[in-house]
Amino acid sequence: MAKKKKMSKAESKHIEKILSMGCCVCVNLELGETPAVPHHISNNSMGMKSSNYEVIPLCPVHHTDGGYGVAVHQGRVQWEANFGTEQELLDQTMEWLNL
């Protein structure tokens, strides 16, 4: 198994900034800013995890706990049909951060 690479200070600061925005799906649904966890988007690079700069903020419900179509890890295709693609949400997140 590959050794985990330690996150740089810049990566850690970037993720903290993203998480401070709250869940991007909840914000889009006008549910307010709910506490978020980092979700690394799927970049289709042969199972490799995306970089720590390809992260969107999702609440636990929209990340893992919400069930099919509500949580990205419970059914990505339906989730993206409901809320937008991961890339669209990443682009929106970067726009919110003025990056």
Residue locations for each model-derived region?
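Extended interaction regions within the primary functional domain
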Residues: 2, 46-47, 60
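Terminal targeting/leader modules
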Residues: 3-7, 89-90
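Short, intrinsically disordered, charge-biased short linear motifs at domain edges
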Residues: 7-15, 43-49
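Short cysteine-rich loop/turn motifs with clustered Cys
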Residues: 9-37, 61
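Conserved catalytic motifs of the protein kinase core domain
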Residues: 34, 54-55
